[in-house]
Amino acid sequence: MIVTIVGWLVLFVFLPNLMIIGTSFLTRDDASFVKMVFTLDNYTRLLDPLYFEVLLHSLNMALIATLACLVLGYPFAWFLAKLPHKVRPLLLFLLIVPFWTNSLIRIYGLKIFLSTKGYLNEFLLWLGVIDTPIRIMFTPSAVIIGLVYILLPFMVMPLYSSIEKLDKPLLEAARDLGASKLQTFIRIIIPLTMPGIIAGCLLVMLPAMGLFYVSDLMGGAKNLLIGNVIKVQFLNIRDWPFGAATSITLTIVMGLMLLVYWRASRLLNKKVELE
């Protein structure tokens, strides 16, 4: 069994990543895509202000989408965890149902809904709230909406798991000692649910930087993410070495985020043990 698992990991994880790393140090060739000539130019190109700006823009968009998911997801997860046990499975089922549909199809549906002639603008015009359609599509806001729409369930699930495990007697003790609802939330609930918050933020932020089809469909050419750069290099420009170098750089950034999560989790566990 162990040999099978190790073989599967080597064949489908280790070797493909090794090929990408190797390709990132090679030279582009118009005929065969890759020339077996070692170079570091692919990584030095990433220091160009254009690509560095795209990377920072991707981090910024991913951070905003993560914060939006946290603000929207925490109250929903709290509401879900406080419902009767008989009702929770139904709402959890409704939360998971969208995963049965391809996310690309869902983004197309959202694009139709938010377009100038879409249902949202038509409804606002009918109410008399606006006189002319609001331009939402092909803006940074549209990309954020698309990312939140796709990734919100990834925030809700770990938050729900953490909130459900809250020690109720501890909350009751805080009330008995005169703590207000705000004090209880800040000093007890948030620290106890911090593992879920960190896990949810990672589950949202890591894929948010690479969902190129969201920025393609919702943001247009002026709102590119680093995932779009990788896609263009592999599929359009056919510069596989530079695309591989960009992929490795993105992987390193994600790895650093995972390292921060691991360190934060260890510190939280030590703090809980001391208390």
UniProtKB/Swiss-Prot annotation:
Family: Belongs to the binding-protein-dependent transport system permease family. CysTW subfamily.
UniProt GO MF annotations: ABC-type polyamine transporter activity
Keywords, ordered alphabetically: Cell inner membrane, Cell membrane, Membrane, Transmembrane, Transmembrane helix, Transport
UniProt record, GO biological process: putrescine transport; spermidine transmembrane transport
Assigned GO CC terms: ATP-binding cassette (ABC) transporter complex; membrane; plasma membrane
Localization, UniProt: Cell inner membrane
PANTHER family linked to this entry: INNER MEMBRANE ABC TRANSPORTER PERMEASE PROTEIN YDCU-RELATED, INNER MEMBRANE ABC TRANSPORTER PERMEASE PROTEIN YDCU-RELATED-RELATED
Domain ABC transmembrane type-1: 55-261
Species this chain originates from: Escherichia coli (strain K12)
Function, as annotated: Required for the activity of the bacterial periplasmic transport system of putrescine and spermidine.
Entry protein name: Spermidine/putrescine transport system permease protein PotB
Transmembrane segments: 1-21, 61-81, 90-110, 136-156, 188-208, 242-262
Superkingdom, natural source: Bacteria
InterPro entries given in the database record: MetI-like, MetI-like_sf
Gene responsible for this protein: potB
Periplasmic side, ranges: 22-60, 111-135, 209-241
Stretches of the chain found on the membrane's Cytoplasmic side: 82-89, 157-187, 263-275
Membrane topology: Multi-pass membrane protein
